[in-house]
């Protein structure tokens, strides 16, 4: 008989200690108060319609499930529902395509606001034991959640089958046998942040809670394939491909898809189902409503959600995500090498079945165990979870407290029974009683597990570029602290905290390694008072005070940096730092900076961010907020700003803007119109400055700078003219432009985040500029642009021409590869015709493809500039924006040859 584990997960924790999870009770205002959760919605007990043909698959008949097991699972589901607060429309989803979905506020978001990738707090996950409440099940979404209707949804089965068919949800429920069983789902990236602390992978920071177990119900896949008459291997039926409804940016735009071998799909022992229920109810949107794959023992990445097509093929899936995701490449292969040498397409590196893994969950991170007469008289119980893949049973879990010299065998609890083929699809729980004095003398606690094939976990982490399948020993460090005056205690530290949350012993060790690798001159100064500040700890409230040009502090990966002395030297201008001053800008920093910039940042580190709730002489946090036993898990309530503002842009904040119009100007140029949050707002972008567009693309934050082409006083919207860099066009950039392709695939009604203003140049009208806070004046402007660099030049020209009293002359030299690449040509030519004395425009193209081209071909040369821009003078400024090689090899040297003082008279956007 299966045993419930909920009440045993934290039974030996010190009452009132930091991190202890108490029993949850329904909120007094909860709609579930007083209900007994019979789970009797329309799907709980399907009634087959009379006179309906049911295609039975006798060879894979369901096991004779023990009624006691079913009742126990039902009790767990009911208990979890009572303890979990209702899901709500999260304020963080406002302005995203997922704003219609209700979610649990305690989920830790790992990729910003959108898409929704999240895991529950580890302690809360373990509190619920064997069956995870659906709102707390980890979520892996590559993009917006598709909207689907139960009555309209169909799944198509096609390819190498005798009878291609489409099935409605009603047919799946009524015409096929169902299978219901608990299955543990695990993301292949579980524990990835540990790898990212060693060396950054291309994946985001999963903690140790990318694992959940629920009861799934659905149709056996093999029954569907048999009904459609799947062909034999000799006729080419080798792979089963799955395709979802979600349209994603990867590969220039594609649906999420993957495949498994036919042998897996048709194996009755594998219990593969097409699921439509989870914990007794219809699937929720985040978990694939109305239909998804469940492949027990496999990684989550093979279990396609929002399932629309099943294709029987000879080859594996051709989906971008089948090849560019869920691989474990050798440690020497980075992203660049993987792309250059096509490592993604080597079949030996694909991940299907999970590997053996285990985690310590008790003690939890930053838990404090006081050492006193009461605690030392009873043992402390270590606890955690373990799992393996392919249906293999976890047979042994061991704990060491001396670095692996000796191992203690733990008690292992398997709450599930194996299926009739002897396979285990769920996690198990382990525990070990230890003496408190032994904990006091230990420096760390480590765990490893073994499965029935005698596979075990490696001692050390093995890095790979995707950060997947990390299963090294899970280590918890111990340190002595003073929870109360006159007492000592043990504080426990897990290796990392999920997402961008700071904390964990790996972050501290990384800091020490960086300090040890510092140049000799830096090492020598460590003993000086200035360098001693690197060991100082700062609270978030202290950092927030340093948000101005007089003192600009930022937080990146838990480290505090004073960027004040770098403000004037920053290539992106002062605003690029000030817009993040006083905040944690880890995500933004990683999105736009190279490894070189990250190393440069170390020169400005002054200390670390305080992430713990204790100090050496302070008490642990034993408070309970109000009468709610689960308030500690609720997200902090943020005070909302007024709904209506005259200016949309808010420094240090991202604002959501909806795409309301998209026009094709040419085959690769689009004009996008984005609505501001309020109809009566203006964007609030000074002339000469730019904005960042932010989006999660291929699981990473992508930020790109754009200058609007609409005038600064447009009300309710702004416009961008964007050149789309498609993949496979430019050999140097085979994947094309990430953001431009993302925008091109963005549907009307979708949102992007906008941040700004940024930039160090501001045109204040009538020839007056403010550059790095210093004023400059010009009567004549030499305006040099390349490619999309025309947009800030165009913006300044717009402002000049809109003011009838602004008499500034503009001499534009605009370089492109071909005539077809010229942006805003009609507008520029129109101004030149209407105002020939004030606006002069000259084009330079590398290769002319049209007859009768009257402008220059080749590159910007000294001769071109001498003929088409004014000579240097006290009232002449040069403005330039374009690719770095153009500025370095064409603009700078040729202006100097003409006599320009490029340090004083050249403004580069």
From Swiss-Prot:
Identify one Pfam family in the record. Answer: Cyt-b5
Positions annotated to bind FAD: 704-707, 721-726, 733, 738-740, 791
| Enzyme class per UniProt | oxidoreductase
The FAD-binding FR-type domain is annotated at 652-764
The keyword Ligase is annotated on this UniProt entry: no
Q: How is its activity regulated?
A: Regulated by the nitrogen source and controlled by the circadian rhythm.
Q: What residues does Mo-molybdopterin bind to? A: 187
For this chain's record, the cofactor binding note is: Binds 1 FAD per subunit.
* Hydrolase among keywords: no
* Listed InterPro entries: Cbr1-like_FAD-bd_dom (IPR008333), Cyt_B5-like_heme/steroid-bd (IPR001199), Cyt_B5-like_heme/steroid_sf (IPR036400), Cyt_B5_heme-BS (IPR018506), FAD-bd_FR_type (IPR017927), Flavoprot_Pyr_Nucl_cyt_Rdtase (IPR001709), FNR_nucleotide-bd (IPR039261), Ig_E-set (IPR014756)
Q: Which GO terms describe its molecular function?
A: FAD binding; heme binding; molybdenum ion binding; molybdopterin cofactor binding; nitrate reductase (NADH) activity; nitrate reductase (NADPH) activity; sulfite oxidase activity
Where in this chain does the record put each Cytochrome b5 heme-binding domain? 535-610
- SMART domains in alphabetical order: Cyt-b5
* Cross-referenced CDD domains: cyt_b5_reduct_like (cd06183), eukary_NR_Moco (cd02112)
GO BP term (any one): nitrate assimilation
Q: Enumerate the PROSITE patterns for this protein.
A: CYTOCHROME_B5_1, CYTOCHROME_B5_2, FAD_FR, MOLYBDOPTERIN_EUK
What keywords is this UniProt entry annotated with? Disulfide bond, FAD, Flavoprotein, Heme, Iron, Metal-binding, Molybdenum, NAD, Nitrate assimilation, Oxidoreductase
Positions with a binding annotation for heme? 570, 593
Query: Which family is annotated?
Result: Belongs to the nitrate reductase family.
Subunit structure of this chain's protein: Homodimer.
Question: Mind telling me what this protein is named?
Answer: Nitrate reductase [NADH]
What is the organism lineage in this UniProt record?
Answer: Eukaryota, Viridiplantae, Streptophyta, Embryophyta, Tracheophyta
